[in-house]
Amino acid sequence: VITALATASGTESELNLDLTDGDRLEVQRTGHPEPIELLLAGEAGTVVVHPDGRMAVDEPVSATILPGSFRPFHQGHRRLAEAAGSITGKQVVFELSVVNVDKPPLEPAEIKERLSQFLGKATVVLTRAETFREKADLFPGCPFVIGWDTAVRLVAPRYYGDSSDNMLAALAEIWAAG
């Protein structure tokens, strides 16, 4: 085992194992998927990306959530986050869904490009939540802050099968999730 670990890490080992003719050393390498790959494959619910670039799969989030596409991350997002943080007294975390009701799914390179805007500045949580109902389930008890354009879409019946009743039911479920 020690020789296999040394070999796998690129270190030469002088350890004599006294292997007999019937013994053999097998080395097996297994790669670990990146957190973004796990999310895209549906094997993770969230990926929290910290300002220093560290990523954590399904790390609990207790913050104010500001969803957006962040293409680009601009002064309006920053000001909305500052206002929300001062009102709620909580840290604001930006949420970027890698899938969207209105757009094709984001590719890994595009996700990384959008995340690069936040390095050293803010925490981002990546999700696959296309709707606010799904977002509320992922972050129970977390307040959400949204801009005007998102508020208009939130109450548009077309996102609820063109049904005002479905929209009101979904909003009630979001409210119930806290």
Question: How would you describe each model-predicted region?
Answer:
Residues 1-178:
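Nucleotidyltransferase catalytic core that binds NTPs
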